[in-house]
Amino acid sequence: MSFKFDWESLRDESFYERAKTILADALNSDSKPPIIVDDITVKDLDLGDESPFLEILEIGDMADDRFRGIFKLNYTGNASLTLTTKVQANPLNVYRQSFDQSSFVAPQFLAAGSSLAIPLNLTLSDIRLSGIIILVFSRAKGLTLVFRNDPLESIKVSSTFDAIPPLAKFLQVQIENQIRGLFRELLPGIIHRLSQKWVTRDETKSNSNTVMSPHVTQPPSPKLKPVSIMDINPDLPALSPTNMLKISALCASQRTLSLFTPSISDAVYRSNLEQFDVVDEESQFQSEDPYDIVRIQSRNYYRHNHQAPKRRTIKYKRKSKKTDEGDNASTEVTTRETTPLPTSSTPLETSTPSREVIREVKEKLLAEPSSVVMSPSEEKTTLRSIPPPLELSPPSLDLSIDTSLRPYASRNNTPEKKEKPQRPAGPSKRNTLPAPTKKGPGFFSSNLAGYDVPPPAYSG
């Protein structure tokens, strides 16, 4: 379902004059940018020959004095609007006007800062609109129109600066943004004020010809005088004596020259609020939000007054320190004495004893009394009773081949080779050590020459 507008009825001159006045007041009501140095005047307004297309999407409420509905609006007509104003062409003058600091620090432009106003004619045409409208009408409040989306699809902007492409493009973008704001904020207010005039005019005509309708609101009654407690019960005092005593005592407590005045409960002093007038270093603005103040104060507190709390560390598997050095020395001596000599045919690398150890051993030997004294004949007999050293034979090498390492043989298919019994190695001249014929420390070094067996190692 759609509407068919009688567009010719809007060509009344009085309607155009009223629309121009309302549109000019709306354009000049808000604060204009400093580049515009004159009022904006509506020079020409033409709604064109083609009417918009309005489609009903939903009707929510309908009665004699109210209506609510949702519509879809499409417009591709030839309406046009021409505005006239003056702009400031000197950017230095614009900068000086927008500079809100003290004149002492402002740059003092001479001839370069003089004003240069240029007239500007701005024409808007070829308007393309497509949007969804929420329309609410009430006989008492008038007509309210709200756009749910951005209705502007395209518009053509013609101005005095069309010969300069950068300025023309800049004006095109800026005017499109302003028109979107016009449809979103200014146009609903303009239509609402016009509808109120039409509704009141219709009401005056109906009141003069017919009886007042019950739907018309009654004029408001005069304001009633407020009733106070003193009017109800004049015997009661205006102020409670208890409250007066508390107030007087509180006032007297502050009449002192002491630096430490008693504080008032549930009260905040202005001197204590100075610490909250802190400018945030990160955002560079003075905050009044209590959460921001708490955040700033806590950060300053932990930054200047206190260190960050240390983390708790737990150490485990820590060896205890040995404080007694004498116990360490005795432990080392006992371990050295109780360590058995390795029974190996290979020589061992032993460290030579220190001079202190040798000196201690000599002192012990000299301190012990010699209980047994042997004669030279007894010494010879004792040396002869020493058994000869063991026969040393070279280690036998196992030269058998492990068949599991062969790539093409398996343990299941290859028969195992039987090992032949080895003959016990008999005594030979090369492998048998002769009986000791010489006593003294050079026995082993002289009699082992020519043998492959290394001499046994001695540990100090």
Curated annotation (Swiss-Prot):
Any single GO CC term annotated in Swiss-Prot or TrEMBL for this entry: ERMES complex
Question: Subunit arrangement?
Answer: Component of the ER-mitochondria encounter structure (ERMES) or MDM complex, composed of MMM1, MDM10, MDM12 and MDM34.
- What name appears for this protein in its UniProt entry? Mitochondrial distribution and morphology protein 34
Q: Is Membrane found in the keyword set? A: yes
> Which keywords are on file for this protein?
Lipid transport, Lipid-binding, Membrane, Mitochondrion, Mitochondrion outer membrane, Transmembrane, Transmembrane beta strand, Transport
Q: Which organism is it from?
A: Yarrowia lipolytica (strain CLIB 122 / E 150)
Annotated gene: MDM34
- What's in the domain note? Lacks alpha-helical transmembrane segments, suggesting that it resides in the membrane via beta-sheet conformations similar to those predicted for other outer membrane proteins and porin.
The GO terms describing molecular function are:
lipid binding
- Stretches with biased composition (Basic residues): 304-321
Chief localisation class: mitochondrion
Q: List all Low complexity biased stretches.
A: 330-355, 393-405
**Family per UniProt?**
Belongs to the MDM34 family.
CDD domains with a match to the protein in the record: SMP_Mdm34
Q: Which GO terms describe its biological process?
A: mitochondrial genome maintenance; mitochondrion organization; mitochondrion-endoplasmic reticulum membrane tethering; phospholipid transport
